């Protein structure tokens, strides 16, 4: 799997794409592959505050329910409501099926995240390849 180079990643398998002061957040292809068929996504509402490293929602698959962890702190400005009716979009293209958009509270948090190549190595080690 090629991970988009302009995204940043967490060891909990979320991605962040930054555009100015806005961060778009989703889960990685590695995460959706590990989860299997996604059947439900629980996300915060617009206006909610999220804190880096803390849960902001969950993803339910046929295998398990997994928490979503915020890669950065901020205020939710937009939620991908299409995932309410089509959560399987995450399985089809995890890097296009974003979950939430936030206004970044502390852009310096971005430096703590993994690059695409570092995340790819981390994910490969996790599965033992």
Task: Label every PLM stretch briefly.
Residues 29, 63, 72:
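A short beta-strand motif that forms part of the nucleic acid-binding face
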Residues 13, 59, 68, 73-76:
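Conserved hydrophobic positions within beta-strands
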Residues 58-69, 86-88:
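Short, Lys/Arg- and Gly-enriched loop/turn segments at beta-strand edges
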Residues 79-93:
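Short, charge-rich, low-complexity interaction segments located
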Residues 1-55, 92-129:
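Acidic, low-complexity mobile loops and tails
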Residues 32-33, 73-76, 81-83:
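Short, charged/polar surface micro-motifs in flexible loops or helix N-caps
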Residues 63, 83, 106:
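Residue-level detector of flexible, active-site-proximal loop/helix-junction positions
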């Amino acid at each position: 799997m090629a991970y988009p180079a302009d995204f940043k990643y967490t060891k909990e398998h979320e991605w962040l794409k930054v555009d100015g002061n806005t961060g778009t957040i989703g889960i990685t292809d590695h995460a959706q592959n590990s989860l299997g068929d996604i059947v439900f996504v629980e996300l915060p509402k617009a206006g909610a505050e999220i804190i880096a490293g803390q849960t902001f929602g969950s993803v339910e698959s046929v295998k398990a329910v997994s928490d979503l962890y915020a890669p950065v702190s901020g205020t939710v400005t937009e939620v991908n409501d299409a995932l309410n009716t089509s959560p399987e979009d995450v399985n089809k293209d995890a890097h296009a099926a974003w979950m939430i958009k936030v206004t970044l509270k502390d852009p310096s948090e971005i430096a703590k995240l993994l690059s695409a190549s570092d995340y790819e190595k981390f994910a490969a080690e996790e599965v033992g390849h």
